[in-house]
């Protein structure tokens, strides 16, 4: 499918030393640079998603204070936690096709602008119903994750996409941990000057302002692809700011929205990855929601200490999830897609076993230590999942990313509903059962098979017809001479 009118000049970036492929995507990952559009997109994407995580998880660390003020029952608090995840299920499913149509930059900014007033409205809640509704709508902001991963896949080539996705999402997820750490401190500071019943309400002004600020930065300094911004949804026009040249693809040459949607929904690999993400990232979300209360109730630590312990779980994302992406890329380079799948299974299985152990440790410091190690593996597993996602479908990448991302929140909703709902929940038992579910569902990775690359237990298909069909939907990496190399990754059996 060739465009009717194409700019024939090679991509021109302010950082002329950055190596790119034929589509202008960076073949190296430089997280500490701002000179190229790739690096700027990376920093804007993770910072925007960071603010959304901060907003969504700004409520749980203040739940003991809010519950006391509004007389919330344990079942109401649990229902609100489920509601926050349920909201993001629908928004993530919608975000994928939206990114395909209008681009990740605009999609991300629109979502942040729409959800910032919701977190601000948390200061106005006065009943259990309004508390649950606020958490439901605040959860919509987590769909920014889909735009984040879509944006990285548009900017970075296949040989570094696992690392780019892992670092971008990992650094963003730290927002949940920082929120657990800072919100009690913000509340305590404000409570020095205002009544407690007012102080917790004023605290929510800060995440709302932060979210709006990042949305403005995304619009001002970001661009959808290495070549420029998508101008509208009817024509795939990309404007190159430096040269004011336009790349045009006529509408009748583009895949229609329906084709994009069907291509993603009909790809079974997307649904398996959604299940795996539900019991890696979904488990992480559930832990973020319950871990502060777990240490507060079981070990009798104070609110600030519980928040600090919970924060350490989320903050480990700064290294753990990127490590998962690095492992995926390293195994992909050495063993091909099969290496990525084996790595995912091993890391997620270990995470499940550690979660089982976390619920069975009876000492405070022992629980903290196991929680730290568990956080490393469960977050790395999330990075490994999105080390596979970009290879499922090029045409329907947004839909596949949306399905997988929604799987994370569906997993969190199901897990919290089954294991952490009600007024008489034994959280230590529920945590161990959550780990067992993680271990069992990790086995589903064995069903993922790519005709040209194989799966965990068998090599690539010898059917050229099946390979040709699949290759048309997959990301293809190219070497410096433009030769496709991703379809011939080395089998291991």
Swiss-Prot record:
Membrane topology qualifier: Multi-pass membrane protein
Disruption outcome: No visible phenotype during vegetative growth. No effect on root nitrate influx. Decreased nitrate content in mature seeds and delayed germination.
TM region(s), chain numbering: 46-66, 70-90, 113-133, 136-156, 174-194, 202-222, 257-277, 299-319, 341-361, 368-388, 400-420, 431-451
InterPro entries assigned: MFS, MFS_dom, MFS_trans_sf, NO3_transporter
GO cellular component, as recorded: plant-type vacuole membrane
Subcellular location: Vacuole membrane
Region described as Disordered: spans on this chain: 1-20
Record keywords, A-Z: Membrane, Nitrate assimilation, Transmembrane, Transmembrane helix, Vacuole
Biased composition (Polar residues): 1-19
Matches recorded under PROSITE patterns: MFS
GO molecular function, one term: nitrate transmembrane transporter activity
Any Pfam family hit: MFS_1
Entry keyword annotation includes Cell inner membrane: no
Gene3D superfamilies: MFS general substrate transporter like domains
Family named by the database record: Belongs to the major facilitator superfamily. Nitrate/nitrite porter (TC 2.A.1.8) family.
Name under which the protein is recorded: High affinity nitrate transporter 2.7
Lineage: Eukaryota, Viridiplantae, Streptophyta, Embryophyta, Tracheophyta
Gene: NRT2.7
């Amino acid at each position: 499918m060739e465009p009717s009118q194409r700019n024939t000049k090679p991509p021109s970036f302010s950082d002329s030393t950055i190596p790119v492929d034929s589509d202008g995507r960076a073949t190296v990952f430089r997280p500490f640079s701002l000179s190229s559009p790739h690096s700027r997109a990376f920093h804007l994407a993770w910072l925007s998603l960071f603010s959304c995580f901060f907003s969504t998880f700004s409520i749980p660390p203040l739940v003991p204070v809010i519950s006391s003020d509004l007389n919330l029952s344990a079942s109401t608090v649990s229902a609100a936690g489920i509601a926050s995840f349920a909201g993001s299920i629908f928004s993530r499913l919608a975000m994928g096709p939206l990114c395909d149509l209008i681009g990740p930059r605009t999609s991300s900014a629109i979502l942040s602008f729409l959800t910032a007033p919701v977190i601000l409205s948390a200061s106005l809640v006065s009943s259990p119903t309004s508390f649950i509704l606020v958490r439901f709508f605040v959860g919509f902001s987590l769909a920014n994750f889909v735009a984040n991963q879509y944006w990285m896949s548009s900017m970075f080539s296949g040989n570094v996409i696992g690392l780019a996705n892992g670092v971008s999402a990992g650094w963003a997820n730290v927002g949940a941990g920082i929120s657990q750490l800072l919100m009690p401190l913000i509340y305590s500071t404000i409570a020095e000057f205002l009544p407690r019943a007012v102080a917790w309400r004023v605290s929510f002004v800060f995440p709302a302002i932060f979210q709006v600020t990042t949305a403005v930065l995304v619009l001002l300094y970001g661009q959808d692809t290495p070549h420029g911004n998508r101008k509208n949804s009817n024509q795939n026009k990309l404007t190159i700011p430096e040269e004011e040249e336009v790349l045009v693809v006529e509408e009748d040459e583009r895949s229609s929205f329906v084709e994009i949607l069907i291509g993603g929904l009909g790809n079974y690999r997307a649904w398996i990855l959604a299940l795996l993400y539900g019991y890696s990232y979904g488990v992480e979300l559930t832990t973020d929601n319950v871990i502060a209360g777990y240490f507060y109730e079981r070990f009798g630590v104070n609110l600030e200490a519980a928040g600090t312990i919970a924060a350490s779980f989320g903050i480990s994302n700064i290294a753990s999830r990127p490590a998962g992406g690095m492992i995926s890329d390293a195994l992909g380079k050495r063993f091909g897609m099969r290496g990525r799948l084996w790595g995912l299974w091993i890391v997620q299985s270990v995470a499940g076993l550690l979660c089982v152990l976390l619920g069975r440790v009876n000492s405070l410091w022992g629980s903290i230590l196991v929680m730290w190690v568990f956080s490393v593996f469960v977050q790395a597993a999330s990075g490994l999942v999105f080390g596979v996602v970009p290879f499922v479908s090029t045409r329907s990448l947004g839909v596949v990313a949306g399905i997988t991302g929604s799987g994370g929140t569906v997993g969190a909703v199901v897990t919290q509903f089954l294991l952490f709902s009600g007024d008489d929940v034994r959280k230590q038992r529920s945590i161990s059962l959550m780990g067992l579910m993680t271990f069992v569902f990790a086995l589903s990775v064995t069903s993922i098979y790519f005709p040209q690359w194989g799966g965990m237990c068998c090599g690539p298909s010898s059917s050229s017809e099946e390979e040709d069909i699949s290759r048309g939907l997959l990301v293809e990496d190219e070497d410096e001479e433009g030769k496709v190399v991703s379809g011939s990754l080395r089998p291991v059996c």
